[in-house]
A protein has these predicted regions:
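Conserved acidic donor-binding segment of nucleotide-sugar-dependent glycosyltransferases
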Residues: 314-327, 335-340
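Carbohydrate-associated surface elements
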Residues: 145, 166
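N-terminal strand-loop element at the rim of the active site
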Residues: 5-64, 149, 228-229
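A conserved mid-protein helix/loop that constitutes part of the nucleotide-sugar donor-binding site
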Residues: 13-21, 193, 197-216, 220, ...
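Short hydrophobic beta-strand element within catalytic cores of glycosyltransferases
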Residues: 34, 299-303
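Short alpha-helical donor nucleotide-sugar binding micro-motif in glycosyltransferases
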Residues: 73, 252-253, 258-264, 269-274
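Aromatic "clamp/platform" in nucleotide-sugar-dependent glycosyltransferases that forms part
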Residues: 282
Length: 415
């Protein structure tokens, strides 16, 4: 089987990292097309043996990418096209139809209740997505929560397949030596209570809530792994609260990047060094960072984590949801500090979300989509789009999602 993956961009992020993990395991010949931003992950994927083509799309409304992508699909002649992220899903489905490929699978990696990929959902975004979704064979949701959101959008049940994200759990196993080494490097005593967080430092992740909560707990330190536009605002916030010496912003990959983003030892070592992990994001599609923390035997406080919330409580006894405010998080951290919970056994939820299992389930979706295409089933119902430029689907245009404000209506710089 030959599979062509089309993704919006390969900048460091959960979707791109997940794609790389899957490419190493899928029993198919795969190639990758990135519409924008190849970055170091493209080099890593190529180093793993998978070709990557960059189409140099200049913006959300760059319609010239459609005939170029369609021509590439004809030249590549894949059995299945698999699209990832909103822009690639919309353009990829249309280009596949233009090229005559009917086995098209799309994964929704970052669909929230009110945002998609960190941007606010609008009526236009929903309408275009729904119209082009009909051109595909299957839509993959990374959690039951995302599947429910797709159903509310009007995606038919028969086209929704839940294939959860997966991790390499062994990479995040607790390492006492790594704990001691990192604490010594940061000047932290063995008995210091240390909180941790990890992710892209952008407003929607709400790491400001985490920083403010820790500043209200004397003697508690925070290790925050990640990079992004909110790095300096968070640093200034810590200083304004007089806690700059207790808020340790480690940078991308926990300050210890490997040759490829996401491959370094920094985040696993950070997880070993802390006592509790916090994921403050209020609207998520899955919750990979929280799952990695559970693989390290940590107690996890989260604002939203469908990977855990969709399952019975006994699957992740160390995970607990908190209200989205600073007060609720501060109280939860204070209680954990008082009880000194210690390390936990790796919970069942971690074994459920194994990346090898994800690859097997995704392969089954490919086989089903390809079998349906080969049986020459009636084409999916046509999308109804207004009139547009010659040679392209009538009036095809991609609405630009509006930037999503922080949930309380203020950016970090306004605090």
């Amino acid at each position: 089987m030959k599979v062509l993956h089309v993704i919006t961009g390969l900048e460091v992020g959960g979707a791109a990292q997940q794609l790389r993990l899957l490419l190493r395991r899928l029993p198919a010949h795969c190639e990758v097309v990135t519409l924008t931003t190849p970055g170091p992950l493209a080099e890593a994927i190529e180093a793993d043996g998978t070709p990557v083509t960059h189409l140099e799309m200049t913006g959300n409304r760059d319609l010239s990418v459609l005939p170029r992508l369609s021509a590439l699909i004809r030249d590549t002649a894949p059995d299945v096209i698999h699209t990832h992220l909103y822009r690639a899903c919309v353009y990829g489905r249309v280009a596949a139809r233009m090229a005559g490929v009917r086995a098209v699978v799309a994964t929704e990696h970052s669909l929230g209740d009110a945002v998609i990929e960190g941007r606010r959902l609008t009526r236009g975004v929903r309408t275009l997505y729904r119209a082009t979704e009909r051109l595909g064979s299957a839509t993959v949701a990374v959690s039951d929560t995302v599947a429910a959101r797709l159903r509310r959008w009007g995606v038919p049940e028969r086209r929704i397949h839940v294939v959860p994200n997966g991790i390499e759990a062994h990479r995040f196993a607790y390492d006492p030596a790594a704990r001691a080494t990192l604490r010594a490097r940061l000047g932290l005593a063995p008995d210091t209570f240390v909180v941790g967080g990890a992710g892209r430092l952008v407003p929607g992740k709400r790491f400001d809530v985490l920083v403010r909560a820790v500043t209200q707990l004397p003697g508690v330190h925070l290790l925050l792994a990640g990079d992004g536009p909110e790095l300096e605002p968070l640093r200034r916030m810590a200083g304004q609260f007089g806690s700059g010496d207790r808020i340790h912003l480690l940078g991308a990959d926990g300050g210890e990047p490997g040759p490829v983003p996401g491959d370094g030892p920094g985040v696993p070592r950070m997880l070993s060094a802390i006592d509790v992990f916090v994921s403050p994001t209020p609207d998520q599609a899955f919750g990979l960072a929280a799952l990695e923390a559970l693989a390290s035997g940590l107690h996890v406080l989260h604002g939203s984590c469908p990977a855990v919330d969709d399952l019975p409580a006994d699957q992740a006894p160390g995970a607990r949801r908190f209200g989205h405010g600073v007060h609720e998080l501060t109280a939860a951290l204070r209680e954990l500090r008082r009880t000194e919970p210690g390390r936990l056994p790796v919970p069942p939820v971690v074994h459920r979300y194994d990346i090898d299992r994800s690859a097997r389930e995704l392969t089954a979706v490919y086989e089903q989509a390809l079998a349906a295409a080969r049986r020459n089933r009636p084409a999916p119902e046509p999308a109804t789009l207004p009139a547009g430029p010659p040679g392209l689907p009538p009036g095809f245009s991609l609405p630009d999602p509006s930037p999503a404000p922080a949930p309380d209506g203020h950016s970090l710089s306004q605090r």
